[in-house]
Swiss-Prot record:
RNA binds at residues 180, 195, 202, 260, 351. This is Nucleoprotein. Residues 1-375 are annotated as: RNA packaging and organization of the helical nucleocapsid. It comes from Peste-des-petits-ruminants virus. It holds the Pfam family Paramyxo_ncap. Ncore is globular and carries regions required for N self-assembly and RNA-binding. Ntail is an intrinsically disordered monomeric domain in the C-terminus. Forms the helical nucleocapsid (NC) in a ratio of 1 N per 6 ribonucleotides, protecting the genome from nucleases. The encapsidated genomic RNA serves as template for transcription and replication; encapsidation by N is coupled to RNA synthesis. Forms the encapsidation complex with the phosphoprotein protein P. Before encapsidation, the newly synthesized free N protein, so-called N0, is chaperoned by P. Participates, together with P, in the formation of viral factories (viroplasms), which are large inclusions in the host cytoplasm where replication takes place. Residues 418-492, 506-525 are annotated as: Disordered. It is found in: Virion; Host cytoplasm.
Protein backbone atom coordinates (compact mmCIF):
# COMPACT_ATOMS: atom_id res chain seq x y z
CA UNK A 1 0.00 0.00 0.00
CA UNK A 2 2.87 2.37 0.77
CA UNK A 3 4.30 1.68 -2.69
CA UNK A 4 0.93 2.47 -4.26
CA UNK A 5 0.76 5.83 -2.50
CA UNK A 6 4.29 6.71 -3.60
CA UNK A 7 3.45 5.75 -7.18
CA UNK A 8 0.29 7.84 -6.99
CA UNK A 9 2.21 10.90 -5.79
CA UNK A 10 4.80 10.43 -8.56
CA UNK A 11 2.03 10.00 -11.12
CA UNK A 12 0.34 13.23 -10.06
CA UNK A 13 3.61 15.16 -10.28
CA UNK A 14 4.39 13.87 -13.77
CA UNK A 15 0.83 14.38 -14.96
CA UNK A 16 0.85 18.07 -14.08
CA UNK A 17 4.46 18.64 -15.05
CA UNK A 18 5.37 21.55 -17.30
CA UNK A 19 6.60 20.46 -20.76
CA UNK A 20 10.36 20.63 -21.27
CA UNK A 21 12.28 21.40 -24.45
CA UNK A 22 13.55 18.26 -26.14
CA UNK A 23 14.00 16.65 -29.54
CA UNK A 24 15.87 18.38 -32.33
CA UNK A 25 15.70 21.72 -30.56
CA UNK A 26 14.28 23.56 -33.56
CA UNK A 27 11.66 26.23 -32.85
CA UNK A 28 8.32 26.13 -34.64
CA UNK A 29 7.74 29.42 -36.41
CA UNK A 30 4.48 30.56 -37.89
CA UNK A 31 3.76 32.77 -40.87
CA UNK A 32 4.88 36.16 -39.65
CA UNK A 33 2.92 39.35 -39.95
CA UNK A 34 5.04 42.43 -40.64
CA UNK A 35 4.33 45.30 -38.23
CA UNK A 36 5.72 48.80 -38.73
CA UNK A 37 6.61 50.53 -35.47
CA UNK A 38 7.56 54.24 -35.65
CA UNK A 39 10.09 55.35 -33.06
CA UNK A 40 11.65 58.79 -32.42
CA UNK A 41 14.85 59.30 -34.39
CA UNK A 42 16.28 61.92 -32.03
CA UNK A 43 16.10 62.90 -28.37
CA UNK A 44 13.98 66.02 -28.90
CA UNK A 45 10.89 66.36 -26.71
CA UNK A 46 9.10 68.09 -29.59
CA UNK A 47 9.62 65.05 -31.80
CA UNK A 48 8.30 62.70 -29.13
CA UNK A 49 5.28 64.80 -28.25
CA UNK A 50 4.40 65.28 -31.92
CA UNK A 51 4.77 61.54 -32.52
CA UNK A 52 2.56 60.84 -29.49
CA UNK A 53 -0.07 63.23 -30.86
CA UNK A 54 -0.12 61.41 -34.21
CA UNK A 55 -0.22 57.98 -32.55
CA UNK A 56 -3.20 58.90 -30.37
CA UNK A 57 -5.05 60.16 -33.45
CA UNK A 58 -4.24 56.98 -35.38
CA UNK A 59 -5.45 54.77 -32.53
CA UNK A 60 -8.73 56.71 -32.56
CA UNK A 61 -9.25 56.22 -36.29
CA UNK A 62 -12.21 53.83 -36.70
CA UNK A 63 -10.90 52.65 -40.10
CA UNK A 64 -7.37 51.69 -39.01
CA UNK A 65 -6.43 48.07 -39.71
CA UNK A 66 -5.38 45.70 -36.96
CA UNK A 67 -1.67 45.35 -37.79
CA UNK A 68 -1.20 49.10 -38.01
CA UNK A 69 -2.98 49.61 -34.68
CA UNK A 70 -0.70 47.03 -33.06
CA UNK A 71 2.36 48.92 -34.32
CA UNK A 72 0.90 52.18 -33.05
CA UNK A 73 0.31 50.73 -29.59
CA UNK A 74 3.80 49.19 -29.36
CA UNK A 75 5.32 52.53 -30.30
CA UNK A 76 3.17 54.38 -27.77
CA UNK A 77 3.97 51.93 -24.96
CA UNK A 78 7.73 52.32 -25.46
CA UNK A 79 7.88 56.11 -25.68
CA UNK A 80 8.70 56.58 -22.00
CA UNK A 81 12.16 54.99 -22.25
CA UNK A 82 15.27 56.75 -23.51
CA UNK A 83 15.89 54.30 -26.38
CA UNK A 84 12.59 52.77 -27.54
CA UNK A 85 14.23 50.90 -30.41
CA UNK A 86 16.64 49.03 -28.17
CA UNK A 87 13.85 48.16 -25.75
CA UNK A 88 11.63 46.74 -28.49
CA UNK A 89 14.43 44.66 -29.99
CA UNK A 90 15.48 43.32 -26.59
CA UNK A 91 12.13 42.12 -25.29
CA UNK A 92 10.39 41.07 -28.52
CA UNK A 93 10.53 37.36 -29.27
CA UNK A 94 7.27 36.64 -31.02
CA UNK A 95 6.93 33.78 -33.54
CA UNK A 96 3.89 35.42 -35.16
CA UNK A 97 5.16 38.90 -36.04
CA UNK A 98 8.16 40.60 -37.56
CA UNK A 99 8.66 44.13 -36.27
CA UNK A 100 10.15 46.78 -38.58
CA UNK A 101 11.39 49.83 -36.70
CA UNK A 102 11.13 53.15 -38.57
CA UNK A 103 12.78 56.25 -37.14
CA UNK A 104 10.73 59.44 -37.23
CA UNK A 105 12.11 63.00 -37.24
CA UNK A 106 10.64 66.47 -37.58
CA UNK A 107 9.87 67.90 -41.00
CA UNK A 108 8.65 71.29 -42.18
CA UNK A 109 7.60 70.05 -45.61
CA UNK A 110 5.20 67.26 -44.64
CA UNK A 111 1.61 67.83 -43.58
CA UNK A 112 2.03 65.68 -40.48
CA UNK A 113 5.12 67.59 -39.35
CA UNK A 114 7.04 64.30 -39.28
CA UNK A 115 8.94 62.24 -41.79
CA UNK A 116 10.74 58.93 -41.90
CA UNK A 117 14.49 59.24 -41.45
CA UNK A 118 16.45 58.05 -44.48
CA UNK A 119 19.77 58.55 -46.21
CA UNK A 120 19.01 61.02 -48.96
CA UNK A 121 15.54 59.75 -49.88
CA UNK A 122 12.50 61.97 -49.51
CA UNK A 123 9.86 60.05 -47.54
CA UNK A 124 7.56 62.95 -46.65
CA UNK A 125 4.70 61.56 -48.73
CA UNK A 126 5.06 58.10 -47.18
CA UNK A 127 5.01 59.63 -43.70
CA UNK A 128 1.91 61.69 -44.53
CA UNK A 129 0.16 58.58 -45.83
CA UNK A 130 1.03 56.64 -42.67
CA UNK A 131 -0.04 59.33 -40.21
CA UNK A 132 -3.06 60.49 -42.20
CA UNK A 133 -6.54 60.09 -40.71
CA UNK A 134 -8.38 61.54 -43.72
CA UNK A 135 -10.83 59.65 -45.88
CA UNK A 136 -9.38 57.94 -48.94
CA UNK A 137 -11.61 59.65 -51.52
CA UNK A 138 -13.16 62.87 -50.29
CA UNK A 139 -10.10 64.16 -48.48
CA UNK A 140 -12.26 65.48 -45.66
CA UNK A 141 -11.27 64.68 -42.12
CA UNK A 142 -13.28 61.97 -40.40
CA UNK A 143 -14.49 62.19 -36.84
CA UNK A 144 -11.92 60.24 -34.88
CA UNK A 145 -12.01 59.16 -31.27
CA UNK A 146 -10.05 61.60 -29.17
CA UNK A 147 -10.11 62.91 -25.61
CA UNK A 148 -13.40 63.42 -23.79
CA UNK A 149 -12.50 67.09 -23.60
CA UNK A 150 -12.91 68.09 -27.24
CA UNK A 151 -11.39 71.48 -26.52
CA UNK A 152 -7.96 69.80 -26.59
CA UNK A 153 -6.67 70.53 -30.08
CA UNK A 154 -3.28 68.83 -29.85
CA UNK A 155 -0.90 67.47 -27.23
CA UNK A 156 2.40 68.81 -28.53
CA UNK A 157 4.60 70.16 -25.72
CA UNK A 158 8.20 71.28 -25.39
CA UNK A 159 8.90 70.64 -21.71
CA UNK A 160 10.06 67.19 -20.57
CA UNK A 161 8.05 67.27 -17.34
CA UNK A 162 4.84 68.18 -19.15
CA UNK A 163 5.49 65.43 -21.68
CA UNK A 164 6.01 62.82 -18.96
CA UNK A 165 2.74 63.75 -17.23
CA UNK A 166 0.89 63.74 -20.53
CA UNK A 167 2.38 60.40 -21.56
CA UNK A 168 1.65 58.91 -18.13
CA UNK A 169 -2.00 59.98 -18.40
CA UNK A 170 -2.35 58.16 -21.72
CA UNK A 171 -0.32 55.06 -20.87
CA UNK A 172 -2.14 54.56 -17.57
CA UNK A 173 -5.42 54.19 -19.46
CA UNK A 174 -3.87 51.72 -21.91
CA UNK A 175 -2.35 49.53 -19.20
CA UNK A 176 -5.57 49.53 -17.19
CA UNK A 177 -7.32 48.05 -20.23
CA UNK A 178 -5.11 44.94 -20.08
CA UNK A 179 -6.50 43.89 -16.68
CA UNK A 180 -9.86 42.72 -18.03
CA UNK A 181 -9.42 42.85 -21.79
CA UNK A 182 -9.21 39.05 -21.95
CA UNK A 183 -11.23 37.83 -18.97
CA UNK A 184 -14.18 40.27 -18.82
CA UNK A 185 -14.10 42.90 -21.60
CA UNK A 186 -17.86 43.53 -21.52
CA UNK A 187 -17.93 44.52 -17.84
CA UNK A 188 -14.55 46.22 -17.61
CA UNK A 189 -15.60 49.86 -17.94
CA UNK A 190 -16.62 50.36 -14.29
CA UNK A 191 -13.43 48.95 -12.76
CA UNK A 192 -11.31 50.85 -15.29
CA UNK A 193 -12.96 54.11 -14.30
CA UNK A 194 -12.39 53.43 -10.59
CA UNK A 195 -8.68 52.86 -11.18
CA UNK A 196 -8.43 55.99 -13.31
CA UNK A 197 -10.01 58.00 -10.48
CA UNK A 198 -7.50 56.48 -8.07
CA UNK A 199 -4.50 57.62 -10.11
CA UNK A 200 -6.09 61.02 -10.64
CA UNK A 201 -6.43 61.47 -6.88
CA UNK A 202 -2.81 60.40 -6.42
CA UNK A 203 -1.72 63.08 -8.94
CA UNK A 204 -0.07 60.47 -11.11
CA UNK A 205 -2.19 61.46 -14.10
CA UNK A 206 -4.05 64.54 -15.31
CA UNK A 207 -7.81 64.11 -15.21
CA UNK A 208 -8.61 66.28 -18.23
CA UNK A 209 -6.68 63.90 -20.50
CA UNK A 210 -9.29 61.18 -20.14
CA UNK A 211 -9.70 59.43 -23.50
CA UNK A 212 -13.23 58.98 -24.79
CA UNK A 213 -15.16 55.71 -24.72
CA UNK A 214 -14.73 54.96 -28.43
CA UNK A 215 -10.94 55.21 -28.19
CA UNK A 216 -10.80 52.97 -25.13
CA UNK A 217 -13.19 50.41 -26.63
CA UNK A 218 -11.16 50.17 -29.84
CA UNK A 219 -7.87 49.67 -28.00
CA UNK A 220 -9.42 47.20 -25.53
CA UNK A 221 -10.79 45.13 -28.39
CA UNK A 222 -7.40 45.13 -30.10
CA UNK A 223 -5.66 43.99 -26.92
CA UNK A 224 -8.24 41.22 -26.55
CA UNK A 225 -7.82 39.91 -30.10
CA UNK A 226 -4.08 40.39 -30.65
CA UNK A 227 -1.86 37.95 -28.75
CA UNK A 228 1.32 39.62 -30.05
CA UNK A 229 0.38 42.93 -28.42
CA UNK A 230 -0.30 41.17 -25.13
CA UNK A 231 3.00 39.34 -25.34
CA UNK A 232 4.80 42.63 -25.77
CA UNK A 233 3.00 44.20 -22.80
CA UNK A 234 3.76 41.23 -20.52
CA UNK A 235 7.41 41.20 -21.64
CA UNK A 236 7.63 44.92 -20.89
CA UNK A 237 6.19 44.38 -17.39
CA UNK A 238 8.70 41.61 -16.66
CA UNK A 239 11.57 43.69 -18.01
CA UNK A 240 10.60 46.60 -15.74
CA UNK A 241 10.42 44.26 -12.73
CA UNK A 242 13.91 42.95 -13.43
CA UNK A 243 15.37 46.45 -13.57
CA UNK A 244 17.48 47.09 -10.44
CA UNK A 245 17.49 50.33 -8.48
CA UNK A 246 15.13 53.24 -8.93
CA UNK A 247 12.82 53.12 -11.92
CA UNK A 248 11.24 55.94 -13.95
CA UNK A 249 7.96 57.25 -12.59
CA UNK A 250 5.96 55.80 -15.46
CA UNK A 251 7.65 52.43 -14.93
CA UNK A 252 6.63 52.46 -11.27
CA UNK A 253 3.07 53.28 -12.28
CA UNK A 254 3.05 50.33 -14.69
CA UNK A 255 4.21 48.05 -11.87
CA UNK A 256 1.38 49.38 -9.71
CA UNK A 257 -1.19 48.68 -12.43
CA UNK A 258 0.32 45.22 -12.77
CA UNK A 259 -1.22 44.36 -9.40
CA UNK A 260 -4.59 44.39 -11.18
CA UNK A 261 -3.26 42.49 -14.20
CA UNK A 262 -1.37 39.68 -12.48
CA UNK A 263 -3.24 36.35 -12.10
CA UNK A 264 -6.08 37.54 -14.34
CA UNK A 265 -8.31 34.57 -15.13
CA UNK A 266 -6.91 32.49 -12.24
CA UNK A 267 -9.41 33.59 -9.59
CA UNK A 268 -10.77 30.07 -9.04
CA UNK A 269 -7.33 28.63 -8.35
CA UNK A 270 -6.11 31.49 -6.16
CA UNK A 271 -9.33 31.77 -4.13
CA UNK A 272 -9.45 28.02 -3.58
CA UNK A 273 -6.00 28.17 -2.03
CA UNK A 274 -6.85 31.29 -0.02
CA UNK A 275 -10.20 30.22 1.43
CA UNK A 276 -10.09 26.46 1.07
CA UNK A 277 -6.58 25.61 2.27
CA UNK A 278 -5.04 28.58 4.05
CA UNK A 279 -7.98 28.87 6.45
CA UNK A 280 -7.09 25.35 7.71
CA UNK A 281 -10.61 24.41 8.81
CA UNK A 282 -11.04 20.76 9.91
CA UNK A 283 -13.28 20.07 6.90
CA UNK A 284 -10.13 19.51 4.85
CA UNK A 285 -9.87 16.13 6.56
CA UNK A 286 -12.88 14.76 4.66
CA UNK A 287 -12.16 11.78 2.42
CA UNK A 288 -13.97 13.54 -0.43
CA UNK A 289 -11.26 16.21 -0.50
CA UNK A 290 -8.27 13.83 -0.51
CA UNK A 291 -7.95 13.53 -4.28
CA UNK A 292 -8.57 17.20 -4.96
CA UNK A 293 -6.05 18.27 -2.33
CA UNK A 294 -3.48 16.19 -4.17
CA UNK A 295 -4.51 17.89 -7.42
CA UNK A 296 -4.11 21.34 -5.86
CA UNK A 297 -0.67 20.38 -4.58
CA UNK A 298 0.42 19.29 -8.07
CA UNK A 299 -0.95 22.50 -9.59
CA UNK A 300 0.92 24.63 -7.06
CA UNK A 301 4.15 22.84 -8.01
CA UNK A 302 3.36 23.37 -11.70
CA UNK A 303 2.67 27.05 -11.06
CA UNK A 304 6.13 27.42 -9.54
CA UNK A 305 7.77 25.57 -12.43
CA UNK A 306 6.30 28.02 -14.94
CA UNK A 307 8.29 30.80 -13.30
CA UNK A 308 7.62 34.49 -13.78
CA UNK A 309 5.13 34.02 -16.63
CA UNK A 310 2.81 31.85 -14.51
CA UNK A 311 0.57 34.74 -13.32
CA UNK A 312 0.04 35.76 -16.96
CA UNK A 313 -0.78 32.33 -18.42
CA UNK A 314 -4.36 33.33 -19.25
CA UNK A 315 -3.35 36.63 -20.84
CA UNK A 316 -0.68 34.80 -22.88
CA UNK A 317 -3.18 32.09 -23.93
CA UNK A 318 -0.97 29.35 -22.54
CA UNK A 319 -2.72 26.02 -23.14
CA UNK A 320 -1.74 24.83 -19.67
CA UNK A 321 -4.24 27.27 -18.15
CA UNK A 322 -7.03 24.68 -18.47
CA UNK A 323 -5.37 22.54 -15.79
CA UNK A 324 -6.01 25.34 -13.27
CA UNK A 325 -9.73 25.51 -13.97
CA UNK A 326 -12.07 24.89 -11.04
CA UNK A 327 -13.50 21.92 -12.93
CA UNK A 328 -10.39 19.97 -11.89
CA UNK A 329 -11.28 20.33 -8.19
CA UNK A 330 -15.04 21.11 -8.06
CA UNK A 331 -15.78 19.97 -4.50
CA UNK A 332 -12.88 21.84 -2.94
CA UNK A 333 -13.71 24.93 -5.01
CA UNK A 334 -17.38 24.86 -3.95
CA UNK A 335 -16.33 24.51 -0.32
CA UNK A 336 -13.83 27.38 -0.65
CA UNK A 337 -16.49 29.64 -2.16
CA UNK A 338 -18.75 28.94 0.81
CA UNK A 339 -15.96 29.94 3.16
CA UNK A 340 -15.21 33.02 1.09
CA UNK A 341 -18.71 34.49 1.03
CA UNK A 342 -18.86 34.24 4.83
CA UNK A 343 -15.46 35.83 5.43
CA UNK A 344 -15.41 38.61 2.83
CA UNK A 345 -18.24 40.79 1.61
CA UNK A 346 -16.46 41.31 -1.70
CA UNK A 347 -17.02 37.63 -2.54
CA UNK A 348 -20.77 38.17 -2.75
CA UNK A 349 -20.60 39.42 -6.32
CA UNK A 350 -18.68 36.40 -7.62
CA UNK A 351 -20.40 34.34 -10.30
CA UNK A 352 -21.11 30.81 -9.03
CA UNK A 353 -23.04 29.73 -12.11
CA UNK A 354 -20.91 26.72 -13.04
CA UNK A 355 -22.10 23.27 -14.03
CA UNK A 356 -19.72 21.68 -11.53
CA UNK A 357 -20.81 23.88 -8.62
CA UNK A 358 -21.95 21.74 -5.65
CA UNK A 359 -24.37 23.54 -3.27
CA UNK A 360 -23.86 20.94 -0.52
CA UNK A 361 -20.15 21.65 -0.22
CA UNK A 362 -20.83 25.36 -0.55
CA UNK A 363 -23.04 25.16 2.53
CA UNK A 364 -20.38 23.06 4.23
CA UNK A 365 -17.96 25.96 3.85
CA UNK A 366 -20.51 28.40 5.23
CA UNK A 367 -21.27 26.24 8.25
CA UNK A 368 -17.59 25.72 9.00
CA UNK A 369 -17.11 29.47 9.24
CA UNK A 370 -20.21 30.02 11.36
CA UNK A 371 -19.59 27.22 13.82
CA UNK A 372 -15.86 27.93 14.06
CA UNK A 373 -16.41 31.61 14.81
CA UNK A 374 -14.47 32.61 17.92
CA UNK A 375 -12.39 29.43 18.08
CA UNK A 376 -8.61 29.68 18.31
CA UNK A 377 -6.39 27.29 16.37
CA UNK A 378 -4.27 25.29 18.77
CA UNK A 379 -1.40 25.05 16.28
CA UNK A 380 -1.23 28.80 15.69
CA UNK A 381 -1.74 29.51 19.39
CA UNK A 382 1.19 27.26 20.29
CA UNK A 383 3.36 28.89 17.63
CA UNK A 384 2.55 32.40 18.88
CA UNK A 385 2.82 31.45 22.54
CA UNK A 386 -0.81 32.23 23.37
CA UNK A 387 -1.89 30.88 26.77
CA UNK A 388 -5.18 29.13 27.48
CA UNK A 389 -6.55 32.20 29.29
CA UNK A 390 -5.65 34.46 26.39
CA UNK A 391 -7.21 32.04 23.92
CA UNK A 392 -10.43 32.02 25.96
CA UNK A 393 -10.50 35.83 26.03
CA UNK A 394 -9.97 35.99 22.27
CA UNK A 395 -12.80 33.50 21.72
CA UNK A 396 -15.22 35.57 23.80
CA UNK A 397 -14.35 38.80 22.01
CA UNK A 398 -14.50 37.17 18.58
CA UNK A 399 -17.91 35.65 19.35
CA UNK A 400 -19.33 39.04 20.34
CA UNK A 401 -17.86 40.64 17.25
CA UNK A 402 -19.37 37.93 15.09
CA UNK A 403 -22.80 38.52 16.62
CA UNK A 404 -22.61 42.24 15.91
CA UNK A 405 -21.50 41.53 12.37
CA UNK A 406 -24.53 39.25 11.88
CA UNK A 407 -26.85 41.96 13.23
CA UNK A 408 -25.48 44.57 10.87
CA UNK A 409 -25.84 42.25 7.90
CA UNK A 410 -23.88 44.56 5.64
CA UNK A 411 -22.81 43.72 2.12
CA UNK A 412 -24.37 41.75 -0.71
CA UNK A 413 -22.87 38.37 0.17
CA UNK A 414 -26.01 36.63 1.46
CA UNK A 415 -28.32 38.28 -1.03
CA UNK A 416 -26.19 36.99 -3.89
CA UNK A 417 -26.33 33.36 -2.77
CA UNK A 418 -29.71 33.23 -0.99
CA UNK A 419 -30.92 30.39 -3.20
CA UNK A 420 -28.37 28.10 -1.53
CA UNK A 421 -29.48 28.60 2.08
CA UNK A 422 -31.14 25.93 4.23
CA UNK A 423 -34.81 26.50 5.00
CA UNK A 424 -35.75 26.24 8.67
CA UNK A 425 -37.94 23.39 9.83
CA UNK A 426 -41.40 23.95 11.29
CA UNK A 427 -40.35 23.15 14.83
CA UNK A 428 -37.16 25.20 14.93
CA UNK A 429 -36.98 28.46 16.77
CA UNK A 430 -35.95 31.14 14.27
CA UNK A 431 -33.16 33.63 14.85
CA UNK A 432 -34.68 36.88 13.58
CA UNK A 433 -31.44 38.67 12.78
CA UNK A 434 -30.11 36.24 10.18
CA UNK A 435 -31.07 36.59 6.55
CA UNK A 436 -31.80 32.90 6.05
CA UNK A 437 -34.61 32.91 8.64
CA UNK A 438 -35.95 36.22 7.36
CA UNK A 439 -36.21 34.67 3.93
CA UNK A 440 -37.78 31.47 5.28
CA UNK A 441 -40.30 33.28 7.49
CA UNK A 442 -42.80 33.90 4.70
CA UNK A 443 -43.29 30.33 3.40
CA UNK A 444 -43.05 28.73 6.88
CA UNK A 445 -44.98 31.29 8.92
CA UNK A 446 -47.83 28.96 10.00
CA UNK A 447 -48.62 25.27 9.80
CA UNK A 448 -51.16 23.91 7.39
CA UNK A 449 -50.72 26.85 5.04
CA UNK A 450 -50.67 26.21 1.34
CA UNK A 451 -47.10 27.26 0.58
CA UNK A 452 -47.26 26.55 -3.11
CA UNK A 453 -46.20 29.77 -4.80
CA UNK A 454 -47.72 31.40 -7.80
CA UNK A 455 -45.65 32.74 -10.64
CA UNK A 456 -45.33 36.13 -8.95
CA UNK A 457 -43.75 34.51 -5.87
CA UNK A 458 -46.65 34.95 -3.31
CA UNK A 459 -48.29 32.15 -1.27
CA UNK A 460 -51.66 31.20 -2.69
CA UNK A 461 -54.72 32.28 -0.82
CA UNK A 462 -52.88 34.79 1.36
CA UNK A 463 -52.28 38.48 0.98
CA UNK A 464 -49.33 40.33 2.47
CA UNK A 465 -51.70 42.11 4.83
CA UNK A 466 -52.93 38.78 6.21
CA UNK A 467 -49.45 37.32 6.44
CA UNK A 468 -47.72 40.18 8.26
CA UNK A 469 -49.80 40.11 11.51
CA UNK A 470 -48.99 36.42 12.01
CA UNK A 471 -45.29 37.06 11.59
CA UNK A 472 -45.48 40.10 13.87
CA UNK A 473 -47.25 38.01 16.51
CA UNK A 474 -44.54 35.35 16.38
CA UNK A 475 -41.91 38.07 16.62
CA UNK A 476 -43.62 39.56 19.70
CA UNK A 477 -43.56 36.17 21.42
CA UNK A 478 -39.90 35.76 20.58
CA UNK A 479 -39.15 39.22 21.96
CA UNK A 480 -41.03 38.57 25.20
CA UNK A 481 -39.18 35.30 25.81
CA UNK A 482 -35.78 36.93 25.44
CA UNK A 483 -34.27 39.14 28.13
CA UNK A 484 -31.07 39.89 26.19
CA UNK A 485 -30.96 43.47 24.82
CA UNK A 486 -29.02 42.26 21.79
CA UNK A 487 -31.77 39.78 21.01
CA UNK A 488 -34.32 42.56 21.33
CA UNK A 489 -32.37 44.64 18.83
CA UNK A 490 -32.24 41.68 16.45
CA UNK A 491 -35.98 41.17 16.72
CA UNK A 492 -36.66 44.84 16.03
CA UNK A 493 -34.51 44.78 12.91
CA UNK A 494 -36.10 41.53 11.76
CA UNK A 495 -39.57 43.05 12.20
CA UNK A 496 -38.54 46.04 10.10
CA UNK A 497 -37.29 43.75 7.34
CA UNK A 498 -40.46 41.67 7.38
CA UNK A 499 -42.54 44.83 7.06
CA UNK A 500 -40.45 45.83 4.07
CA UNK A 501 -40.94 42.36 2.60
CA UNK A 502 -44.69 42.68 3.02
CA UNK A 503 -44.61 46.04 1.26
CA UNK A 504 -42.77 44.47 -1.68
CA UNK A 505 -45.35 41.67 -1.87
CA UNK A 506 -48.18 44.22 -1.83
CA UNK A 507 -46.58 46.07 -4.72
CA UNK A 508 -46.32 42.81 -6.63
CA UNK A 509 -49.97 41.99 -5.92
CA UNK A 510 -51.09 45.34 -7.31
CA UNK A 511 -49.26 44.68 -10.57
CA UNK A 512 -50.65 41.16 -11.11
CA UNK A 513 -49.91 41.24 -14.84
CA UNK A 514 -46.23 41.73 -14.13
CA UNK A 515 -44.46 38.34 -14.15
CA UNK A 516 -41.42 39.41 -12.14
CA UNK A 517 -40.25 36.92 -9.52
CA UNK A 518 -39.69 38.12 -5.98
CA UNK A 519 -36.01 38.62 -5.27
CA UNK A 520 -34.66 39.37 -1.81
CA UNK A 521 -31.78 41.33 -3.33
CA UNK A 522 -34.21 44.25 -3.70
CA UNK A 523 -34.54 44.28 0.08
CA UNK A 524 -31.10 43.33 1.30
CA UNK A 525 -28.90 45.20 -1.17
Amino acid sequence: MATLLKSLALFKRNKDKAPTASGSGGAIRGIKNVIIVPIPGDSSIITRSRLLDRLVRLAGDPDINGSKLTGVMISMLSLFVESPGQLIQRITDDPDVSIRLVEVVQSTRSQSGLTFASRGADLDNEADMYFSTEGPSSGSKKRINWFENREIIDIEVQDAEEFNMLLASILAQVWILLAKAVTAPDTAADSELRRWVKYTQQRRVIGEFRLDKGWLDAVRNRIAEDLSLRRFMVSLILDIKRTPGNKPRIAEMICDIDNYIVEAGLASFILTIKFGIETMYPALGLHEFAGELSTIESLMNLYQQLGEVAPYMVILENSIQNKFSAGAYPLLWSYAMGVGVELENSMGGLNFGRSYFDPAYFRLGQEMVRRSAGKVSSVIAAELGITAEEAKLVSEIASQTGDERTVRGTGPRQAQVSFLQHKTDEGESPTPATREEVKAAIPNGSEGRDTKRTRSGKPRGETPGQLLPEIMQEDELSRESSQNPREAQRSAEALFRLQAMAKILEDQEEGEDNSQIYNDKDLLS
